[in-house]
């Protein structure tokens, strides 16, 4: 297998979370599952391999939703932990479900490619090993840890802890300027119509854009 590399880029924790919930929202609704989350982080902007981070949680959430019966719940909690390295942050993400759970025997091999849970026919598990082996590879590559707590019939909790570089707000400015394909000198003094329905995002964007000499008018959406 080819050597995997980290492609570090700018991301916001809430954007990544929102993106994942958009992917699984319909599926959860169809199964009448409660999909909920809590976020408690001091630093919102990060530099990391956002594609691999998303892939980790796509696999975990996909299994959580797949193996949780109608009327159950999947909860995601995201917390920032103290980090001993300057300029970095630790983010712990827990995904807990009320699903069918896993046997202790299966748990010990969960991250080996192509392992499958055979113990229960009602679970109809088709084989989640490949997804989990990728998850483990990506977590290792990003210098993180993953552990699983589970009991048959009582659901599972996956805990992933990853270290990300903290991005300062200049990355946010750069992103806005790159998206508008122009330099801040050209923008200075211009009026900007900011279409953003999230109050926190809007507040951050307004502060940054005003600092770059722009006049801001905000609307809730682009319609």
How would you name each of these model-derived features?
Residues 102-116:
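Short conserved segment of the HATPase_c
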């Amino acid at each position: 297998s080819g050597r995997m590399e980290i492609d570090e880029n700018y991301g916001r924790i809430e954007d990544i979370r929102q993106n994942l919930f958009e992917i699984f929202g319909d599926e959860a609704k169809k199964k009448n599952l409660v999909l909920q989350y809590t976020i408690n982080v001091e630093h919102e902007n990060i530099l990391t391999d956002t594609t691999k981070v998303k892939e980790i949680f796509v696999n975990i959430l996909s299994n959580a939703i797949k193996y949780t019966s109608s009327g159950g719940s999947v909860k995601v909690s995201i917390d920032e932990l103290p980090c001993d390295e300057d300029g970095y942050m630790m983010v712990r993400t827990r995904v807990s479900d009320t699903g069918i759970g896993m046997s202790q025997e299966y748990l010990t091999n969960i991250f080996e490619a192509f392992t499958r849970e055979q113990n229960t026919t009602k679970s109809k598990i088709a084989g989640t090993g490949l997804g989990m082996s990728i998850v483990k590879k990506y977590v290792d590559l990003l210098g993180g840890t993953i552990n699983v707590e589970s009991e048959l019939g009582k659901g599972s909790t996956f805990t992933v802890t990853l270290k990300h570089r903290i991005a300062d707000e200049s990355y946010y400015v750069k992103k806005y300027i790159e998206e508008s394909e122009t330099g801040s000198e050209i923008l200075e003094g211009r009026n900007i119509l900011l279409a953003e329905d999230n109050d926190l995002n809007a507040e951050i964007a307004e502060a940054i854009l005003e600092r770059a000499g722009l006049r801001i008018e905000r609307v809730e959406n682009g319609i």
